[in-house]
């Protein structure tokens, strides 16, 4: 089928035992730029792949998650796989598994019932599911046993299984903010630049913002500014290497001053400029409080 050539990578179908790590696996693929459709009934998978493979679709990498709850819908996953093979649209089938005792512990830790428990014991539900998915497990292209894997280990296992995924650019968001409005809750790292002189106290600069040249020139011309930015980038490089090793490709850095209008904005823009020049990162900026009083 010619439409399949429009995908940058073969479609991935994620399935497996409930509690085996399907959600975590989906998150890894989302972080790697995949469009991930969750809890898709088997019969809908064919239409989904056809839609995303059409010339009008913006989707270049796709994965779909389907689990034992799909039994509520007509059609089986085995029938869907057969149909996809006939259409020359065979996805890579990723099956997530774990030992029964580990699955029991995971369900107990989140106080959830198993979808096939049906009023019986958790162990009975897991055994019923294992019997139901055995034939699909036998058809899997990749089986990952998550019994002894942490979330980071699972990420590395998926990246190893799908090769070049691990070589994508890291995404860095530099977010300026004002401490008086609170630090960004999603920041992985928070930097305080209130040690720099505040343009707010320079009457002719007060009405400008850090994106304006007069303020940027004032802030960046301070004796402490350039050494700080140099040292920050050196430190941040070592952090990026560690983040990559841990499979973390989306990093948010909060850069704060008092109000989020001047110093933090100017420093954020300068750091972003330097990082973009290198070409090894996908860098974006956000000035959270620049328009606030």
UniProtKB/Swiss-Prot annotation:
Q: Which UniProt keywords apply?
A: ATP-binding, GTP-binding, Nucleotide-binding
Instruction: Provide the residue positions that the database annotates as binding ATP.
Output: 16-23
User: What residue intervals traverse the membrane?
Assistant: none
Instruction: Supply the name of the protein.
Output: Nucleotide-binding protein cauri_1197
Name the source organism: Corynebacterium aurimucosum (strain ATCC 700975 / DSM 44827 / CIP 107346 / CN-1) (Corynebacterium nigricans)
Entry's Pfam families?
A: PapZ_C (PF22740), RapZ-like_N (PF03668)
What's the domain of life for this entry? Bacteria
Does the UniProt entry include the keyword GTP-binding?
yes
Q: Does the keyword Protein biosynthesis apply?
A: no
Q: Name one GO molecular function term.
A: GTP binding
Q: Where does GTP bind?
A: 67-70
The record's InterPro entries line, in alphabetical order, gives:
P-loop_NTPase, RapZ-like, RapZ-like_N, RapZ_C
Q: What does this protein do?
A: Displays ATPase and GTPase activities.
Q: Which family does it belong to?
A: Belongs to the RapZ-like family.
């Amino acid at each position: 089928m010619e439409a399949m050539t429009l995908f940058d990578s073969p479609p991935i179908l994620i399935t497996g035992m409930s509690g085996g790590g399907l959600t975590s696996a989906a998150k890894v693929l989302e972080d790697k730029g995949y469009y991930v459709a969750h809890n898709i009934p088997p019969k809908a998978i064919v239409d989904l792949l056809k839609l995303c493979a059409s010339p009008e679709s913006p989707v270049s990498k796709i994965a779909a998650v389907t689990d034992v709850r799909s039994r509520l819908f007509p059609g089986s996953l085995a029938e869907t796989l057969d149909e996809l093979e006939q259409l020359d649209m065979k996805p890579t089938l990723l099956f997530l598994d774990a030992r029964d005792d580990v699955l029991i512990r995971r369900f107990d830790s989140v106080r959830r019932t198993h979808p096939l428990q049906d009023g019986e014991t958790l162990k009975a539900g897991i055994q019923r599911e294992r019997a139901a998915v055995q034939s699909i497990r036998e058809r899997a292209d990749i089986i990952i046993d998550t019994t002894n894997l942490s979330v980071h280990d699972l990420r590395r296992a998926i990246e190893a299984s799908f090769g070049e995924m691990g070589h994508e650019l890291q995404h860095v968001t530099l977010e300026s903010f004002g401490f008086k409005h609170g630090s960004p809750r999603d920041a992985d790292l928070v930097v305080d630049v209130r040690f720099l002189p505040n343009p707010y106290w320079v009457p002719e600069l007060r009405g400008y913002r850090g994106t304006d040249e007069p303020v940027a020139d004032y802030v960046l011309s301070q004796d402490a500014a350039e050494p700080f930015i140099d040292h920050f980038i050196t430190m941040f490089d070592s952090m990026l290497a560690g983040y990559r090793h841990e499979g973390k490709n989306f990093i948010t850095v909060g850069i704060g001053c008092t109000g989020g209008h001047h110093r933090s904005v100017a420093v954020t823009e300068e750091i972003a400029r330097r990082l973009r020049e290198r070409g090894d990162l996908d860098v974006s900026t956000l000035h959270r409080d620049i328009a606030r009083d």
